[in-house]
């Protein structure tokens, strides 16, 4: 058996990635989120596949088909709610995973980090298009507002929007193509995950101390496989509690009203996991400026490795940077709250301040903190 595991071309890849992989002996629960994301992706693809068997991507029947899934299909309701709330769990794990990378300086593994950013964009695009599919009020108006942002692109903006819509408004063509993209992108994400892991295994994992762990490695199996299984069970427990007891907790009541192009909802907002970016978008009065800020809110992650000034890798022994990191977390929570509020005083001012603070912490204060900490340690 050992020979097959180590000799067979396919089994060897799996063995070197999940069984005999040398892993640092001190990685904490913050390193669990990678495997949890894999569980989320598998769960989303599986539940999504079963939903696609019963869903119709036509404006006249899309809303009814989702209702049909919930009412008439055997266990359709549980599949639908696992898929909807699974997306929320996915983003919780994603943000924790990125946060871990920021805190412990995992962004120094440049290739892995950059593929991770592309993955983040892919999954955000997938989630946005998935939100359009039930064809409720918030689906329709969310699609209209977000796709309309592309009209801010100089010269080609209007043509670009109409090209994406497949017409002069969000309609049947838009829904059909969004369904097609929503179906294919998770598989693109799966391929990117493989590349992500490929680059990670080239260098080996980071660890909480930030120093090389080459002198102290342990096999991934059984030490971290058992830890990952525990994490996955906890994830599924939380997901199922959400699905069984409060499936609509994170959704929008407006999406239970069929899409109506003649009636605009009083407050158009995306799902909770996009609210921080939506708040940054809204905090700039200029359309093009808002769109650029929206893109930069995620793209800023790409320049983080270039702005690393500290001689230490992680923030474990850097109190000033730690303070700034948790200030950033609080700022993102504030932005998430603001994104769900109406555009009126005092929310506009709070959103603008929080947006400025977000970019200031990441691009200015954190590099300065690194320099100060080096100086304090006489480095």
Swiss-Prot record:
Domain of life of the native organism: Eukaryota
InterPro entries: Cyt_b/b6_C, Cyt_b/b6_C_sf, Cyt_b/b6_N, Cytb/b6-like_sf, Cytochrome_b, Cytochrome_b_C_euk/bac, Cytochrome_b_N_euk/bac, Di-haem_cyt_TM
One MF term in the entry's GO annotations: ubiquinol-cytochrome-c reductase activity
Membrane topology: Multi-pass membrane protein
Transmembrane regions listed in the UniProt entry: 33-53, 77-98, 113-133, 178-198, 226-246, 288-308, 320-340, 347-367
Main location: mitochondrion
Biological processes, Gene Ontology terms: mitochondrial electron transport, ubiquinol to cytochrome c
Binding site for heme b b562: 83, 182
Record's cofactor remark: Binds 2 heme b groups non-covalently.
PROSITE patterns tied to this protein: CYTB_CTER, CYTB_NTER
Binding site for a ubiquinone: 201
GO cellular component: mitochondrial inner membrane; respiratory chain complex III
Binding positions (heme b b566): 97, 196
Keywords from the named record: Electron transport, Heme, Iron, Membrane, Metal-binding, Mitochondrion, Mitochondrion inner membrane, Respiratory chain, Transmembrane, Transmembrane helix, Transport, Ubiquinone
Cofactor field: heme b
Residues in coiled coil: none
The UniProt record lists the keyword Membrane: yes
Pfam families, per the entry: Cytochrom_B_C, Cytochrome_B
Other noteworthy facts: Heme 1 (or BL or b562) is low-potential and absorbs at about 562 nm, and heme 2 (or BH or b566) is high-potential and absorbs at about 566 nm.
Task of the protein: Component of the ubiquinol-cytochrome c reductase complex (complex III or cytochrome b-c1 complex) that is part of the mitochondrial respiratory chain. The b-c1 complex mediates electron transfer from ubiquinol to cytochrome c. Contributes to the generation of a proton gradient across the mitochondrial membrane that is then used for ATP synthesis.
Family note: Belongs to the cytochrome b family.
Subunit composition and interactions: The cytochrome bc1 complex contains 11 subunits: 3 respiratory subunits (MT-CYB, CYC1 and UQCRFS1), 2 core proteins (UQCRC1 and UQCRC2) and 6 low-molecular weight proteins (UQCRH/QCR6, UQCRB/QCR7, UQCRQ/QCR8, UQCR10/QCR9, UQCR11/QCR10 and a cleavage product of UQCRFS1). This cytochrome bc1 complex then forms a dimer.
Record protein name field: Cytochrome b
């Amino acid at each position: 058996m050992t020979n097959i595991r180590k000799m067979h071309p396919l089994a060897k890849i799996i063995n070197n990635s999940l069984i005999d992989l040398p892993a640092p002996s001190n990685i904490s629960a913050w390193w669990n989120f990678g495997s949890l994301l894999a569980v989320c992706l598998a769960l989303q693809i599986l539940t999504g596949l079963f939903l696609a068997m019963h869903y119709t991507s036509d404006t006249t029947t899309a809303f009814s088909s989702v209702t049909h899934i919930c009412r008439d299909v055997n266990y359709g309701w549980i599949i639908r709610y696992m898929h909807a709330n699974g997306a929320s769990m996915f983003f919780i794990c994603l943000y924790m995973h990125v946060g871990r990378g920021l805190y412990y300086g995992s962004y120094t593994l440049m290739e892995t980090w950059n593929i991770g950013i592309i993955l983040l964009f892919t999954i955000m695009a997938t989630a946005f298009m998935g939100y359009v599919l039930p064809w409720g009020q918030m689906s329709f108006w969310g699609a209209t507002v977000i796709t309309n942002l592309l009209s801010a692109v100089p010269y080609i903006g209007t043509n670009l929007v109409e090209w994406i819509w497949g017409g002069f408004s969000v309609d049947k063509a838009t829904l059909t193509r969004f369904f097609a993209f929503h179906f294919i992108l998770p598989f693109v994400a799966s391929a990117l995950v493989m590349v992500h892991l490929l680059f990670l295994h080239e260098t080996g994992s980071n660890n909480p101390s930030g120093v090389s762990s080459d002198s102290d490695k342990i096999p991934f199996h059984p030490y971290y496989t058992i830890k990952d299984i525990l994490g996955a069970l906890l994830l599924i427990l939380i997901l199922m509690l959400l699905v069984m007891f409060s499936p609509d907790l994170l959704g929008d009541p407006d999406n239970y009203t069929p899409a109506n192009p003649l009636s605009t909802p009083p407050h158009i907002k995306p799902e909770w996991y996009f609210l921080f970016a939506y708040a940054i978008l809204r905090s700039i009065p200029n359309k093009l400026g808002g769109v650029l800020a929206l893109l930069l809110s995620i793209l800023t992650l790409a320049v983080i490795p270039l702005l690393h000034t500290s001689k230490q890798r992680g923030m474990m022994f850097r109190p000033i940077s730690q303070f700034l990191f948790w200030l950033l977390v609080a700022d993102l929570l504030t932005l998430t709250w603001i994104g769900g509020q109406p555009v009126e005083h005092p929310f506009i001012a709070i959103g603008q301040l929080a947006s400025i603070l977000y970019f200031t912490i990441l691009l200015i204060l954190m590099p300065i903190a690194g320099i100060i900490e080096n100086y304090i340690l006489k480095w």
